[in-house]
Amino acid sequence: MXNIRKSHPLIKIVNDSFIDLPAPSNISAWWNFGSLLGVCLALQIVTGLFLAMHYTSDTATAFSSVTHICRDVNHGWVLRYLHANGASMFFICLYLHVGRGLYYGSYMFKETWNMGVILLFAVMATAFMGYVLPWGQMSFWGATVITNLLSAIPYIGTDLVEWIWGGFSVDKATLTRFFAFHFLLPFIISALVMVHLLFLHETGSNNPTGIPSNMDMIPFHPYYTIKDILGLFMMILVLLSLVMFSPDMLGDPDNYTPANPLSTPPHIKPEWYFLFAYAILRSIPNKLGGVLALVLSILILIFIPFLHTSKQRSMTFRPISQCLFWLLTADLLTLTWIGGQPVEHPYVIIGQLASILYFLTILVIMPLASLAENHLLKW
C-alpha cells in the first residue's frame, strides 16, 4: 500500500510543498523569512478575527470599543497588542525578505518576484486601513492625508477621493468600508501567497551563490523545518517581549486621543514601516510629483530584474555591488528617520538628498557598478 502522504490528493500537496520538497543544501538563515511571513499572516488573521468580534466600526463607538477590548475582554489587551506589534514583525520580516531577494538575485525568478511585489502592496494597503480603525487622532488624520493624495490625479482626482470617503470628508462611511476591506484583504493575501509559492516551486529556491543547485538538493523536512522552527522561536521571543514589556513602543501617543476633525495633531505621520515612503513623498514640493515618487518608491521593485546587468546572479562575489547594497540600506534607514521628523531645516534637505540617492542608486549606480564588475572580471 502506498504512503498516504504521497497518495492522498490534499496531503500530497502539503508533502510536495513542506516535506519532500527538494531544497538547496546551502541556503542560509536569510531564507527563513518566507516561513516567518506565513506565521505572521496566520497570527494576524487569528488575532484580527477575535478583535473583530468585539470591535464596532462606527465613528461614535470605534475608539471606545478598542478601549473596551483592552480593559474588559479577557486577555483582550494581549490580542490587541499582538495584532499591532504583529504588524510590525510582519513588516520587519517583509523588508528583510525583499532585501534578501535583492542581495542574492532571487528577483531573476520574475513571476515569483512580481507576485511578491503585488503581495507587498496588498499588505501595505491592509496595514494602512487597519491603522485607521482605532479612530484615534493619528488614525483620522492619517486617513485624511493619505486618501487626499489621490486628489492629485488629474481630472478624476477629487471625485475619486469623495467616492473613497463616501462623503465630503473622512467619516462614518469611510471607517465602515475600511473595516470591511481590512477584514477581507488578508484572505486575498493568503490566496496570493499560494500563487507566490506555486511560482516558486516551479523553479525551486535560489541559494547564496546564485549558481543552480539542481545537483545538490536535500529534502525540506527535517533539515529546513528545524531551521525554520529556530527562526520562529526567535521571532516569537522578540514579539512577546514587545507585547509584554513595551507594547506602545512602536505606536504613536496621539492615537490614544479620540479622533477630532477640528484639531490637527502637530506632526501627522504614519506607522514606522511607512516612514521611508512618507519621507520620499514629503521631499517633493509638488503634490502630483510626490504621489508619483511615493508609488514609484515601491513599484521600482518591478523593474529590478530588467536593471540586472551583471553576469553573476548573486552579490556574494561582487564587492562593489555589496557596498552599494548597504549604502541603499543605510539610505532607507535615513529616510525612515527623516519621515518621523518635522518639516523643517535640516530635515527637509536631508530627506531630499536621501530620496535622490535612493532612486539614483537603484536606477543608475548599481547597474553601472555591475557592468564595471563584469569588465574587471574580463567577462
From Swiss-Prot:
Its main location: mitochondrion. The keyword Membrane applies. CDD domains: cytochrome_b_C, Cytochrome_b_N. It comes from the Eukaryota. The chain crosses the membrane at residues 33-53, 77-98, 113-133, 178-198, 226-246, 288-308, 320-340, 347-367. The lineage of its organism: Eukaryota, Metazoa, Chordata, Craniata, Vertebrata. It is a multi-pass membrane protein. InterPro entries: Cyt_b/b6_C, Cyt_b/b6_C_sf, Cyt_b/b6_N, Cytb/b6-like_sf, Cytochrome_b, Cytochrome_b_C_euk/bac, Cytochrome_b_N_euk/bac, Di-haem_cyt_TM. This is Cytochrome b. Heme 1 (or BL or b562) is low-potential and absorbs at about 562 nm, and heme 2 (or BH or b566) is high-potential and absorbs at about 566 nm. Its cofactor is heme b. Heme b b566 binds at H97, H196. GO terms for cellular component: mitochondrial inner membrane; respiratory chain complex III.
